[in-house]
């Protein structure tokens, strides 16, 4: 047995499923997960000492590359001053001001430690602000693992959702309406039927949890128009897309001003940090100013804030997003060409430093489209690349990520590996 196998067996004896987040167990692709020992730049090394070119990027945060020397130095310096205080710090103010400068929709902001905390609190805040209970989410969009959002679509188009996890009471989800992404007719009907009861709509403005799915321009406009018409809060869940698809997030590309925004991943620079923010009148409903309660022992942790501030500084340097976007487009175009040459039905898409790979003729517009793609084809591709030391997320439903550490030469090397894999798949 190699070290990965030994550690996985050992982990399963003490950690449920052997992992601390389900997708890491390789359940949807089969095989043994790689236990990572270290990471640097565009690479990760497993416990066997094998180096992989990494397109997981810690599921998005590693936008400047793993263990960026400036970020590491900043974290080490901050740690010398203490690891956690449970009290306000100047750094909290500075990072909130910086985010508000980059993302003008954020008039007030609060820091938390995880994306789940951010979305959970944003939902609570929207309900407290509007005095309404019902919420709309979209099938295939993931907003963390709070009870109200662990919901799958009901049996009919406009039935309220069913729990998608054991342990979630039906009473928690009866207020959650699950609609099809990019389906304007369903959205209009939902508001026509229940508009005055809907507290908020929460949406991934580019979906990253049913692979990368783009919204149509008309869908985005309908989201903003209907929420404004009925007095519902529009929540952009930019935990994944914020500072990843563009400096100002997806909202800057859409030209949309959401009422609330949740963010995470990139803003922590690899450390546990997330936030929610938006309109002043809504945000001031949060305790201690208002009656909506939220708290956290490690919220605004000084080490995470330091890492986040340095990362935000780096990504604002000249040419950062132009180069990131070019490298990501180079990757997906190379993959499309390689698959076409091998006669494999495949396409790919990207926005900023985020990309999607689809074993289908066309990129999906919603969850049903994605579910019809060739999942077995993805599994073959995933293992073919992994066996050749290139790592992607172990699920056909996860987007991938390019970092500033991925050079044009490294992208070319990855495409050359994909040429081999697609040829092998075609044989």
From Swiss-Prot:
Name of the encoding gene: hemL
EC numbers for this chain: 5.4.3.8
UniProt pathway annotation: Porphyrin-containing compound metabolism; protoporphyrin-IX biosynthesis; 5-aminolevulinate from L-glutamyl-tRNA(Glu): step 2/2
Cofactor(s) annotated in UniProt: pyridoxal 5'-phosphate
PROSITE patterns, A to Z: AA_TRANSFER_CLASS_3
GO biological process terms on file: protoporphyrinogen IX biosynthetic process
UniProt cross-references to Gene3D superfamilies, sorted A to Z: Aspartate Aminotransferase, domain 1, Type I PLP-dependent aspartate aminotransferase-like (Major domain)
Entry's family note: Belongs to the class-III pyridoxal-phosphate-dependent aminotransferase family. HemL subfamily.
HAMAP family membership: HemL_aminotrans_3
SUPFAM superfamilies hit by this protein: PLP-dependent transferases
Catalytic activity: (S)-4-amino-5-oxopentanoate = 5-aminolevulinate
Domain of life: Bacteria
Main location: cytoplasm
Subunit structure: Homodimer.
Sorted UniProt keywords: Cytoplasm, Isomerase, Porphyrin biosynthesis, Pyridoxal phosphate
Any one GO molecular-function label of the UniProt entry: glutamate-1-semialdehyde 2,1-aminomutase activity
One Gene Ontology cellular component annotation held by this UniProt entry: cytoplasm
Compartments where located: Cytoplasm
Modification sites for N6-(pyridoxal phosphate)lysine: 265
The protein, known as: Glutamate-1-semialdehyde 2,1-aminomutase
Origin organism lineage: Bacteria, Pseudomonadati, Pseudomonadota, Betaproteobacteria, Neisseriales
